[in-house]
Amino acid sequence: MSLVYGLVVNGPAYGSQASRKAFQFAEAVLAQGHSIKKVFFYQEGVLNASSLILPANDEVDITKQWQELALRHDIELETCVAAALRRGVIGEEEASQHQLKQHNLAVGFQQAGLGGLATALLKFDRVVQF
């Protein structure tokens, strides 16, 4: 039986194992034939969606890995808009709305509210938080 998963990532790209563990879990779930419809980045997890993250050459680029996984498996990558704005991760729409000249939301990520997550939770067989 194939299950539909949703993931919630609360840890930043670096300085915590949460994002890396979530990514490894996602790969394992997909390899077993299940699907993941959404990865929601919340609290410090929104930092995974910054296009300004530049890891050293010998480090894993977790943001790029999330982007590639999402493309390969049609997974939505969403950040909590309030948490993201609070931490300086700004999408193009929010930059325009707040009259900012720059935005730094990485390609493939979208910003959404917690209401969107709550609605999506009803569609998943399993939700795993990291």
Swiss-Prot record:
UniProt-annotated catalytic positions: C80 (cysteine persulfide intermediate)
EC code: 2.8.1.-
Subcellular location: Cytoplasm
GO molecular function: sulfur carrier activity; sulfurtransferase activity
Record GO biological process: tRNA wobble position uridine thiolation
Key words of the record: Cytoplasm, Transferase
Chief location of this protein within or outside the cell: cytoplasm
Top-rank lineage group of the source organism: Bacteria
Pfam families: DsrE
Role noted for this protein: Could be part of a sulfur-relay system.
The family this protein is said to belong to: Belongs to the DsrE/TusD family.
Protein name according to UniProt: Sulfurtransferase TusD homolog
Protein species of origin: Aliivibrio fischeri (strain ATCC 700601 / ES114)
Recorded name of the encoding gene: tusD
